[in-house]
Structure formats: structure tokens, C-alpha cells
Amino acid sequence: MAAAAELSSSSGSERSLEQCSSPLLTREVLCEVFRSLHTLTRQLNLRDDVVKITIDWNRLQSLSASQPALLLTALEQHVLYLQPFLAKLQSLMKENSTATEIRQTEAETKSELRAIHPTEDLQDEGKPKDCDVGDVKKTQNLFDPEVVQIKAGKAEIDRRISAFIERKQAEINENNVREFCNVIDCNQENSCARTDAVFTPYPGFKSHVKVSRVVNTYGPQTRPEGIAGSGHKPTGMLRDCGNQAVEERLQNIEAHLRLQTGGPVPRDIYQRIKKLEDKILELEGISPEYFQSVNFSGKRRKVQPPQQNYSLAELDEKISALKRALLRKSREADSMAAHLP
């Protein structure tokens, strides 16, 4: 019984001692934390006018001690908050050490080159005259890493190139849809902006493709006729309008539009050219690929037989005539069947 009483009394005294020392230990840890802040400012050489931490140690000792669990949680959160900054500083130190090693290697290589080829044998700095090919290649490989603008790996560069191509393709697709298709039916499996095109005129134009008209304020048309044709001898091309440049323009446009050449020439030749050029501009505004298959050459194109080429109006007229003939034959057949007994 006496031994049990002694054990209980000793354990109770130890428990009371721990309870008394726990607030003191917590207060001591808190004081050391604030002292570390003072130490940090001194290590960073920060003056009092930059960072000033004022702590009343007497009042801090007299304050009631905080709970150890609360202090532990606060310190752990603070350490976790500082860990990303530690990682950034470590990576920065590695980069600085790598740059320092590169500069040291460059300096050593330059010193070796100077030792092998003294300055008396060099006419210009950076242009060795008696160096062998290997030393010249070494000097060419030396460069400042700060000059490199794109610091990325091959995979990243390939990703950027593919992203650029995809973005440009998306812009082209969007432009085709905007210019050639008014409404897109997303439920269709097979569709295209060109095949499903709905004629939507471009704002300010008669077509759905933006075109620009060039106005030449100075050119052959503004010059006197005597100056324009004074230095040229008359050739076979001058028999139509009397001006070689104008005749060439007419031939190019007529070949471009596949018009039948010959016939009476209007009196105002420039008005004729203007009408032809306006027609080309209108057709190219409807579709840029309208004349894509036309190949220009220096020679004039041969005129195809008129019976092989038909316009839309001529085709419509032939179709309507064929319908009328078939309708007339069917009526005649019906009338003959009605007269039969």
C-alpha cells in the first residue's frame, strides 16, 4: 500500500510539473519565432527604415501562453507557405550556377585560344588569320546564351508550330463560312461552305467576296496620243484601235472572258475596256476560282466554234423549246386517240 501511494504521489507530481512547464515551453517557442524574424532582417542587411519589427519582450512574457496545438498549426501553415519560394530560389541558384560555369568555360577557351594564337598574329579581333579549321569552328560555337530568343525544347516548338497551323486553318474555315455560307446545318454529315453557299452580298459590294478597285491617276491614258505612239512602228496589232497598249489590254480581257473577237469596235475604246474590266471584277467577286483554270499566254486564243459553247440563257431557251415540242406532240396524240372509233 505504501509503495502504491508513493507511485501515485510521484506520478501526480510529474503531471503537475508538466502542466506548469507546458505554458513556459510554449511561450519560449513563441519568443524564439519572433527572434528568428529579427535575425532574418539582420542577415538580409535590412535597415530599420525599410523593415522595422518592434516586440515588447516583457509584455510578451507576461501574456497568457497560447495553446501548443494552435502554435503548431500556425507554424506548419507558415512553413508550407514558404516551401514554394524555397523551390523557386533553388531553381534560380541552379540557373545562376549554370550560367557561371558557361562563362568560366568561355573564358578558359578564349584564354587557350589567345595562348595558341598570340595577338600579334591577329589583324582584327575575332578574325584569326592563321588558325586551323578546328579552332575556327570552336570560336564560332561560342555565343552568348542571352542572345537566344526561343528557349524551348523540340517538343514545345513542334507544339507551337502545330498550334499555329491549326489556328490559321480555323481562320480560313471561318472566313469561308462567313463569305460563302449564310447558315450552317450542323446535322448534315456531308457539307461544305462552298457547296452549301448562300448568296450573301458583302456590305458595300455586289458580291459576297470583298474586292478592291485600283484607280490609276497617271498612265498611258492620261498621256497625249502623239507621245504614246511616237517611238513605235505600226504593226499588225494597230489595225483595230490604233494603240498597241490598248489593243493588248483588249486581247487579254477578251481571252480572259472567252469572248468572240472581231466585229464592229465601239467608238469610245476606253468605255469598252471599262465595261469588260467591270465584268471581270463582278465575276471574280462572285467566286475567286472563276478564272483559276484560265492560262494566259502571249498568243491569242483560238475562238471555239459557236455551236459548242452555249450560255445559260441559250440553254434555257432550248429546254423550253423542247418542252413545247413534247407538249404539242402529246396533245396531237391525245386528239388522234379521241377521234378513233
UniProtKB/Swiss-Prot annotation:
Which terms are listed as keywords in the entry? Acetylation, Cytoplasm, Isopeptide bond, Nucleus, Phosphoprotein, Repeat, Ubl conjugation
Residue ranges of region Interaction with MAP3K12?
170-341
* Example GO molecular function: protein kinase inhibitor activity
Where does the protein end up? Nucleus; Cytoplasm
One record GO biological process: regulation of DNA-templated transcription
User: Which residues does this entry mark as bearing N6-acetyllysine?
Assistant: K299
What name does this protein carry?
Answer: MAP3K12-binding inhibitory protein 1
What is the organism field in this record? Answer: Mus musculus
